[in-house]
Amino acid sequence: MTTLRLATGATASRILGVGSFQPERIVTNDELSQKMDTTDQWIRERVGIQERRFAAPDERLVDMAVIAGSKALADCGLSPSDVDTVILANCTMPTPIPNGAAQVADRIGIKAAGAFDLNAACAGFCYALATASDLVRSGSARRVLVIGAEKLTDWVDPVDRSNAIIFADGAGAAVVGPADEPGIGPVVWGSAGDLVETIGMTDRRFIYQEGQSVFRWATTAIAPIALRALEASGLQPADIDVLIPHQANLRIIEAIAKRLRAKGAREDMVVADDIVLSGNTSSASIPMAMDHMRGAGRIKPGDVALLIGFGAGLSYAGQVVICP
């Protein structure tokens, strides 16, 4: 009988560094109100967004991913040769083939990389982070560059008030590598396929969503999933220093934080609100928020952060990480 050799991986994994990128163009609520029936007050009250970034017509998803990924490598002092795998979480590549990850790896200089795209919509970064962690711990990869990048403006009707005010463009990245102590907890993930029709694409290839249905689901289902992620890591709500949910809607974020505090999370728990100035960037929103919060001094190395992604599918994923 032939016996196969198994790879031997690291005892644990952690996030080594993070980076992000946003396009230069800032789009305010007042600018949008000139194109559709809306106002700055209406947008702020319903979704909490003040401004967002739109990519230029010639600025591609892959371009943004390359910059964010390069910044994440620089953040932890690694060179492209130190990484052997690239995962690109996204749901807005202009074509299904070729995959974006291989292009990103080549442009950054990560030669002969294992490279693949992962589509779990707004939950994509958490799915990709869990996959990267398992690759490192199984021995299938040494270090993994995980990127969430989206050019949502290519897929949004510019005069659709329900969506054009929300979605934006950008990229966020993290480098995952070996660790002596766990820095990325077990993932809790799943889906609600019976709600698949609540977010999708129109015949014109524009994003649509049943906003009220998504809001009800997110404000009731996500906090219990977050609690399960804490339990999987052996932690209590009071152990959370930072809550970084997908930046879908400020009202959803506030509802999740309120429910976690009702279960024992601290009043001084820092809650990501990057959506206010960045909009909803789908799979990019969590790593982008982490990078922005760290740069602003709102989180520090060693903080315990609860990540929770959720979106089209409907899909969700959450895990606890130690901030780099």
Sequence positions of predicted segments:
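Short, well-ordered amphipathic alpha-helical segments that serve as non-catalytic structural scaffolds
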Residues: 38-39, 61-76, 217-233, 286-293
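Condensing-enzyme catalytic core mediating Claisen C-C bond formation in acyl metabolism
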Residues: 1-57, 159-220, 224-228, 310, ...
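Buried hydrophobic positions in well-ordered alpha/beta secondary-structure cores of metabolic enzymes
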Residues: 15-17, 43, 72, 83-86, ...
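Glycine/charged-rich beta-loop-alpha catalytic/anionic-binding loops adjacent to active sites
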Residues: 49-51, 82-87, 106-119, 155-159, ...
